[in-house]
């Protein structure tokens, strides 16, 4: 649906922003192009384009000491899950070599797993590769402050001003 079409645009902007603002990340990916896929997954983990999902509990359950009744509305934070320090050491660090970057839950999990996740991942990776190939001197425009991703659905920077 619309999320599968819009997500690669947001994900590409977020991936490029992280590559351009994390010391050594862009240089590592340029030196080892095989890292682009992992860098995309790491950016999907750290800055998911959709940060929360709404669900209804199908059974009563206790999570971290909180009781949730069957039928209750639950808001799931993908952004928080993707920064779980029990799963991702140094969870707030963008690491293009993170061994388990693909273990993120940006595309949900289980029966609600995004059916377009593979397409979104391939499109994002292709867009990042194309940008890096087309603009070897790509960098943030120094006359503008580095943007920050914003929003809870289609989260991305409002603008990514670059020069090359």
Regions of interest found by a model, annotated:
Residues 1-164:
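Cytochrome P450
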């Amino acid at each position: 649906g619309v999320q599968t079409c819009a997500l690669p645009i947001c994900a590409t902007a977020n991936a490029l922003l992280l590559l351009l603002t994390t010391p050594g990340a862009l240089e590592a990916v340029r030196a080892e192009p095989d890292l682009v896929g992992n860098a995309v997954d790491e950016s999907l983990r750290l800055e998911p384009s959709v940060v929360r999902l709404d669900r209804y509990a199908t059974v009563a359950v206790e999570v971290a000491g909180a009781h949730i009744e069957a039928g209750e509305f639950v808001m799931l934070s993908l952004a928080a899950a993707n920064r779980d320090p029990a799963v991702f050491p140094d969870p707030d660090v963008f690491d293009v070599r993170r061994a388990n970057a693909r273990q993120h839950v940006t595309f949900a999990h289980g029966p609600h797993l995004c059916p377009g996740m593979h397409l979104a991942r391939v499109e994002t990776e292709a867009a990042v590769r194309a940008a890096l190939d087309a603009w070897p001197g790509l960098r943030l425009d120094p006359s503008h402050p580095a943007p920050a991703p914003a929003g809870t659905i289609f989260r991305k920077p409002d603008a990514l001003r670059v020069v090359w």
